[in-house]
């Protein structure tokens, strides 16, 4: 995260600036990010995760508890049937698209339906949940309908590329079913990539691309690689850190191992998520940009023209 945005967010949380002022800083940094990505030769752009709200804040029927006496981990309250009227992410994408030139594709990141379901179940008191949703299937129906509306809204705004972020280790049957249902019901022509733990990906049906944490300790490598065989797999060649130049040979060897399972025409590279850095600094930010250049070098090795 840029230092100017970190500072603005800190001042906003301290009551020193308004939400409108924070939004203006976010907008400026997103414009700078788009232009920097273009100058680096990147053709898919995002807002960098620079917006500052909770994804569930705009949902109907659910809110964050305001009392400090809430049980630990039970921070959400279901107040009625869950749904969506207008999510601010629609306005955020409109801003991203308006500032993206014709030679780049704007991509929107969204928590996966299964991830949202599991968060609601984990952070809501069971008694409160039962009073509104005595049958879990009704909750699944409401979440599926809300996501359908959100994806249709994004599609109407011009979005053609969504990346769902899924859970990293835990999975329930209900979460898997919900993910697959939302994928089935998405607008035709909406490309969806899915980034999640191995177990989630193996049970996923209908995604266009898979973001794979190949170096993840919970990853059953051979099982996962056979799963993505003959699929349009997006392979993340590094997970939790930004590599140095001297590590390229090692990373190339890992990529070449993957080519035993995935045709090169179905393979691409993705960079580690900046959110993996717990305390981002200006030095980390510069290393992120250096990694963009290293990724281009790696792509030249793996995908020679």
Label for each model-derived stretch:
Residues 1-305:
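Domain-level signal for soluble alpha/beta catalytic cores
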């Amino acid at each position: 995260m840029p230092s100017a945005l970190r500072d603005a967010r800190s001042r906003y949380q301290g009551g020193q600036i308004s939400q409108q002022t924070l939004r203006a800083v976010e907008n400026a940094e997103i414009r700078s990010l788009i232009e920097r990505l273009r100058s680096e030769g990147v053709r898919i752009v995002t807002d960098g995760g620079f917006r500052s709200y909770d994804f569930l804040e705009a949902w109907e029927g659910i809110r964050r508890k305001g009392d400090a006496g809430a049980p630990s981990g039970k921070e959400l309250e279901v107040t009625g049937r869950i749904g969506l009227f207008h999510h601010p992410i629609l306005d955020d994408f409109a801003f991203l698209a308006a500032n993206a030139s014709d030679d780049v594709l704007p991509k929107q990141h969204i928590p996966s339906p299964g991830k949202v379901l599991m968060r609601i179940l984990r952070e809501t008191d069971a008694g409160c949940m039962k009073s509104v949703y005595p049958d879990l299937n009704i909750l699944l129906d409401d979440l599926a309908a809300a996501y359908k509306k959100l994806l249709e809204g994004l599609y109407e705004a011009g979005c053609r590329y969504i990346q769902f972020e899924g859970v990293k280790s835990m999975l329930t049957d209900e979460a898997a079913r919900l993910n697959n249902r939302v994928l089935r019901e998405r607008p035709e022509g909406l490309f969806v990539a899915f980034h999640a733990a191995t177990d989630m990906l193996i049970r996923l049906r209908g995604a266009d691309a898979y973001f794979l944490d190949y170096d993840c300790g919970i990853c059953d490598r051979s099982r996962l690689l056979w799963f993505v065989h003959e699929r349009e797999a997006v392979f993340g060649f590094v997970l939790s850190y930004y590599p140095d130049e001297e590590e390229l040979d090692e990373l190339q060897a890992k990529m070449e191992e993957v080519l035993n399972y995935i045709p090169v025409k179905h393979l691409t590279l993705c960079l580690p998520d900046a959110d993996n850095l717990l305390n981002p600094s200006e030095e980390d930010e510069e290393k992120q940009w250096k990694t963009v250049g290293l990724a281009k070098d790696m792509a030249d090795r793996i995908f020679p023209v």
